[in-house]
UniProtKB/Swiss-Prot annotation:
Active site: E138 (proton donor/acceptor)
Biased composition (Basic and acidic residues): 170-181
Keywords from the UniProt entry: Hydrolase, Nucleotide metabolism, Nucleotide-binding
Organism from which the protein derives: Enterobacter sp. (strain 638)
Physiological role: Catalyzes the deamination of dCTP to dUTP.
UniProt similarity note: Belongs to the dCTP deaminase family.
Assembly and oligomerization: Homotrimer.
Reactions catalysed, as given in the entry: dCTP + H2O + H(+) = dUTP + NH4(+)
Signal peptide: none
The protein's name in its UniProt record: dCTP deaminase
Protein residues bound to dCTP: R110, S111, S112, L113, A114, R115, D128, V136, L137, E138, Y171, K178, Q182
Length: 193
């Protein structure tokens, strides 16, 4: 059962859930908290690798990822990031989120943006219990026109679901937590699997 707006506010007030900066009450509705787009992005360099063998030797996977991922792009205030049709890019939420060991989060895109072809997550929309950091968005433009994305715009909504009890291995305590405390648009670390 997901937390309703009243319970989200209570969890925030009690410090059981942290969203920084704390969203105003106007952005907490029904079962969701609206989140905004941050100013950090990464793109994929075109045709710098013939392919990436995801199950190949880790050093080869790592080298291929280094070839295809751009350095982090940090936009200045007022700048826009242009996502062209058929392109995939990474970005982050403006807000940082910290979940306790007994709560899982879910990121959903906005219907108004989806109707223009923008997907804010390709498959990874679960936020594990114990997570702390900015949420990476996996943008894909399935539309016909380039989309201008500006830091600060409403980009998605988070919902939260209590677990039956605290997880024994929450994300922030796992030794293999590849994205712990991420602050930017961190590229895939599949080579760390």
């Amino acid at each position: 059962m997901r937390l309703c707006d009243r319970d989200i506010e209570a969890w925030l007030d009690e410090g059981r859930l942290s969203i920084t900066p704390r969203p105003p009450v106007e952005r907490i509705n029904g079962v969701t908290v609206d989140v905004r787009l941050g100013n950090k992005f990464r793109t994929f360099s075109g045709h710098t690798a013939a392919y990436i063998d995801l199950s190949g030797p880790k050093d080869e996977v790592s080298a291929a990822l280094d070839r295809v991922m751009s350095d982090e792009i940090v936009l200045a205030e007022g700048e826009a990031f242009y996502l062209h049709p058929g392109e995939l890019a990474l970005a982050v939420t403006f807000e940082s989120v910290t979940l306790p060991a007994d709560l899982v989060g879910w990121l959903d895109g906005r219907s108004s943006l989806a109707r223009l072809g923008l997907m804010v997550h390709v498959t990874a929309h679960r936020i594990d219990p114990g997570w702390s950091g900015h949420i990476v968005l996996e943008f894909f433009n399935a539309g016909k026109l380039p989309l201008a994305l500006r830091p600060g715009m409403m980009i998605g909504a988070l919902s939260f679901e209590p677990l039956t009890g605290p997880a024994d291995r929450p994300y922030n305590r796992r030794q293999d937590a590849k994205y712990r405390d991420q602050q930017g648009a961190v590229a895939s670390r599949i080579d760390k699997d």
